[in-house]
């Protein structure tokens, strides 16, 4: 009985680590992604990101979450819906979700009028959210 309790307690204590990508997960996704982009895209991204790697940038959106200036972006890390629903039929969060966020990031990056600062910010978010999207239970 004691062993079972200790095992369950261990899982509960570390449960956030079990369902959370964390730095290593995001950086792994960033590194893998970097190996699959065209040279043209790589050059454009390096210019925009000041030479920082996709792996390094991939954690940016989590790093800014606790800053009050960026709190509005917190719901963009995930989407909630019932198990028997698909995204189109699910109730949407009025503050946005990861699907909305990816669309917004792409829209800014495609815009001819977006500033370099905005392009850099939304590219960093996009890199992170693609990693979040591929994490089960996120």
For the regions a protein language model found, what residue spans apply to each?
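Bacterial Sec-dependent N-terminal signal peptides
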Residues: 1-24
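N-terminal, motif-rich segments that launch catalysis or mediate targeting to/interaction with membranes
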Residues: 17-129, 136
């Amino acid at each position: 009985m004691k062993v079972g309790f200790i095992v369950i307690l261990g899982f509960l204590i570390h449960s956030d680590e079990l369902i959370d990508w964390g730095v290593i997960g995001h950086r792994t996704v960033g590194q893998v992604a970097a190996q699959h982009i065209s040279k043209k895209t790589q050059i454009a991204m390096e210019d925009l990101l000041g030479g920082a790697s996709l792996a390094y940038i991939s954690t940016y959106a989590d790093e800014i979450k606790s800053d009050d200036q960026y709190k509005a972006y917190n719901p963009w890390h995930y989407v909630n819906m019932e198990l028997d629903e698909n995204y189109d039929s699910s109730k949407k969060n009025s503050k946005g979700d990861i699907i909305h966020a990816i669309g917004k990031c792409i829209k800014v990056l495609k815009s001819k009028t977006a500033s370099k600062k905005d392009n850099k910010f939304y590219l960093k978010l996009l890199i992170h959210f693609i990693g979040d999207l591929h994490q089960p239970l996120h």
